[in-house]
């Protein structure tokens, strides 16, 4: 049976595209056709371009599969690129140590957008502050720690929405000058365009390239420009803001430090009538305005405060690169200035203080060799020092030379220089010099020393009072005048109760006993060592409140007379040494109280026989041989020039023992250290609770202070 191809071989051949040469045998032609149809499946890629005409039957399906794979690959690349940009925009993602996966990036981005829109979890809104602090207290603490002020500005118009009251101590401007104005009015005119770029959120806000600080590569702005529209994108810029001229008296005292810092961080002295500016570093975020759940009043929307975004930032004073020596008073004169040179000595930078030191403007010195201003005799010395400091690499080298000022005078300058090296290449970049006017520095130091010396000499000596003593006669015949007015002082208010407790009858009673103590122990012709004038009376004076200064005398009557006189004159406190008042009948220096003193005072044996032994007048002997077992801490005269070390309650017992020795010459029996002594024949003390009784305990005086210390 014949096949269709065998019946009509030419028709079969006509269905095959292209020209095919058929052999004579029909079956051979049919086999040749089938082989031709099966060949593209095995070696289609190695066929010549002419043979691709045979593949048009399966071509559309193959090309569609290849196009689908390419489209998927491009879509994945774009998604990876967008997620990478999203990761850079979200602060929480960029802060991670390792790169997060795509799901983490999307989750963090959603959380960040919710927090920016104010739709986050309300239960955690108050977790950022302690429970015991209010919002106002927290705001003041943050602003005080930041040493700046908080302000909110509309992004589109620049109108000030809010400013904290701390703007007054920082910029010396009240809040009223900021409210109702724009931030463009508060900054320097040259910084307006820079501020407008920071407030703008459009795609075309900035052009150029951006340096990626993480990788160190420079990227085009088009890759990062989408960050400008992010509501939580960070802003950090430096600008010059206008300062006010409010008087300092209206500011609190704790803001004086901030005011000094603002003057030091200023841009130098300004001309009369010109506005003064301070360098302010502003850091903050662009946020949505108004926040979620808050509506803007109609009057605010009419004036243009209905912006979609706002800048919330904190402004802090920025330390300027040019040091300014002007203080608040403006009286300090600089004595030094900084300069920067290359290795050849050419000046590349000089700070403005050179105007006050050498008279030149900074532009007059830039680009010139420092040797041009040096004295010809010192040029070789200065050149060698520059060569040496380059070799030292970082070490400081000082040199003194004569510098020619602008008024053609030679000024002695001390220059301390060192080199700055590039940390990567270890090459010397430049030389930094500190130039000091030696003469002016010495003058300022001398003035400071004189001021300190004057401050010590102007010490008020009225704080060291001396009682107004009556006029007496020195043993040499020279009169002793009364104390000057500088030694006068009112009664100490600490002992007002004690003075108030003294009645008129007590004063009269004590003054009546002054007649019995009129005799003198020493004759007027007895020698009195002159070296005693510089001796401190702290070792021979007993200080008791109410009975100010009692020096030992020959009898109890003289002591009581002295007490009465001092009570009428006022309260006295000793702080050290004072000029003595020798030769006074009522106050005589006794050898019995010369503890630690190296000046023996001769006494009349007839009138002073009980204490005229060498043991009483010797500086190293015991002043009270009969009381050696009672008061070991009080009568130890081996402590030269020392203060009393004994208990205050034992002073009266020794005073009474001296009284008995002078009147009757009887020897006291040795008493035990803890035994109580009774004073039968002693007048009661003013304000004594035991007044009217014959017996009382000497421990009642234990709380009376002896020689209270006073700092000079």
From Swiss-Prot:
Q: Name one GO biological process term.
A: regulation of transcription by RNA polymerase II
Amino acid composition bias (Basic and acidic residues), ranges on this chain = 63-73
Renumbered residue ranges of the record's region Disordered: 1-20, 35-74, 573-712
Where found in the cell? Nucleus
Q: Where is the PAS domain?
A: 134-209, 323-393
Main localization, broad class? nucleus
Cellular component (GO) terms are:
aryl hydrocarbon receptor complex; cytoplasm; nucleoplasm; nucleus; transcription regulator complex
SMART domains from the UniProt entry: HLH, PAC, PAS
Q: Which UniProt keywords apply?
A: DNA-binding, Methylation, Nucleus, Repeat, Transcription, Transcription regulation
Q: What segments bear the compositional bias annotation Low complexity?
A: 597-626, 653-675
Q: Name one GO molecular function term.
A: DNA-binding transcription activator activity, RNA polymerase II-specific
Q: Which residues carry this modification: Omega-N-methylarginine?
A: 42
Entries under Pfam families matching the protein: HLH, PAS, PAS_11
> CDD domains annotated for this entry?
bHLH-PAS_ARNT, PAS
Tell me the ranges covered by the bHLH domain, including all copies.
63-116
- Subunit structure comment from the entry: Efficient DNA binding requires dimerization with another bHLH protein. Heterodimer with NPAS4 or SIM1. Heterodimer with the aryl hydrocarbon receptor (AHR) or the SIM1 protein. Interacts with TACC3.
Read off the PANTHER family from this record. Answer: CIRCADIAN PROTEIN CLOCK/ARNT/BMAL/PAS (PTHR23042)
Q: What does this protein do?
A: Transcription factor that plays a role in the development of the hypothalamo-pituitary axis, postnatal brain growth, and visual and renal function. Specifically recognizes the xenobiotic response element (XRE).
Can you say what this protein is called? Aryl hydrocarbon receptor nuclear translocator 2
Query: Native species of this protein?
Result: Rattus norvegicus
The gene from which this protein is expressed is Arnt2
